[in-house]
Amino acid sequence: MSSQTDQSTKRILIADDDPVMRHFLTSIVRKEGYDSVVVDDGREAYRILQSDADFRAGIFDMIMPHLEGLDIIRYMRTEKRLQRIPVMMISAERDLQLMAKSFVAGATVFLTKPFNIEQFQTTLRILLVNKTATRKVPQ
């Protein structure tokens, strides 16, 4: 995928099993000028990524049914076509080890729930301008 396509895509993949959180995230993403592809579990996010790499970013809940956010990130970092997609990990867990695991796996930013609109918008903007999303996970 060319860098021109990378910059022009306006879609963000959102995976969270909480319907209220999905609505919250989607509404803010829309206000920021992006379209959302929204799923309620990790397995569905994985299926989408297997056939569609045209996303500006991914926002994944840490704990979801079937496949966790960390597993999605690990998969993305093994696929060259997905490595350019920056990822925000969100979690209700306030655990520094969990945060560290997210960054080691390849997350670009980490946001702990609960968060407010301003916190999410700021983190989203950081995510969308981050140029280090293509880093590879150490083997």
Regions found by a protein language model. Give the residues of each.
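The feature encodes the CheY-like receiver
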Residues: 22, 65-66, 83, 95
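Charged docking surfaces used in two-component/phosphorelay signaling
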Residues: 23-31
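Short hydrophobic/Thr-rich beta-strand motif most characteristic of the beta2 strand and flanking loop
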Residues: 33-40, 48
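Active-site beta3 strand of CheY-like receiver
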Residues: 53-60
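Short, glycine/charged-rich "phosphate-handling" switch motifs in NTP-dependent
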Residues: 108
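C-terminal output helix
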Residues: 115-124
